Amino acid sequence: MAVVMSLIGVARDVTDLVLLRLVAGLVGGYASASIVMVGTQAPRERAGWALGVLSTGALAGNLIGPLVGGFLPSLVGIRGTFFIGGAIIAIAAVATITLVREDFDRSVDVKLKTMSKITKQSASSPFVIASLLATAMMVLLANMSIEPIITVYITNLGVSNQNLTRVAGIVMACSAFGSMLTAPRLGALADRIGAWKVIVGCLLATGLTMLPQAFVTSWWQLAILRGLMGMTIAGLLPSIAKLVRHTVNESNSGKTLGYLQSAQFSGQVVGPLLGAQIGAHVGLHEVFFVTGGLLLLAAMANQFVRTRFISEDVTRV
């Protein structure tokens, strides 16, 4: 990834840029592998908290990265920005190799490690996994749905063109900032009361904070609501990853957590497309109505799965 990012800095034309970005996407599996590693190495009773801390780090990067990326070109140029990005990735790679230790032993009997009553029941229901993957996609879809319309929507709120980019960046960053504040706490809450309850509660809260965003009259109101939405949405991905970790056999946990990452990437793709189509053909306010409605439907669907497919003695997982 460090090499590919640096090569983008010497791209000759658009074709080179597109191909290198494609390769970057193909080799950019660090996030997926880190979730798999934390999910499988952390103690089961602390998995929610550990994944919440990991989520906080990722969200901090999403918050700081665009700010640094917007600042560096004026100092080192656009191409130089890619070289610096490659160097940062190389530092992360060296730090991971030298500092991170994995307790992995292929000879361990995975059945003795993980085949508990919870695993046996949940593994028999692929519908549970499908529901979790769909929910993960919905989380990113909801968070990214306003990306194509944010500048137009903020313009309608009276923001001048000279401040438009800055205000749009603040509004989008508020969601990540709110998630940073609550992700570890909600992950720990999932360890205490059960991930299913956290998922259903966070979906309801996120849907309810999405709907009022259609009625704001000033950009700062939108920023506050996006921050609140970030605080509620933060508990979803750690809780989903925790459930996936508990639901499948140890031998399949890495593969299934990889599917979870693919579902999240799908949400990142579908969200902006859906938001753009609704905004262009129906209206800007309807983007929030549709997204909020989908989140509320997802909450009801997860509650149905929880009560229909999960027995009472394992709902605290």
Segments (PLM) and residue ranges:
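Paired small-residue
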Residues: 4, 15-23, 209, 220-228
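Helix-breaking motifs and short loop linkers at transmembrane-helix boundaries and internal kinks
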Residues: 10-15, 215-217
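Short amphipathic helix-loop junctions that connect adjacent transmembrane helices
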Residues: 149-166
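Cytoplasmic helix-loop-helix junction between adjacent transmembrane helices
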Residues: 20-58, 242-243
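Pair of pore-lining "gating" transmembrane helices in MFS-fold secondary transporters
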Residues: 126-145, 227
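Structural signature of the two symmetry-related core transmembrane helices
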Residues: 1-6, 86, 197-212
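Helix-to-loop junctions at the C-terminal end of transmembrane segments
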Residues: 181-194
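Juxtamembrane intracellular "pre-TM" segments in multi-pass secondary transporters
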Residues: 101-132, 316-317
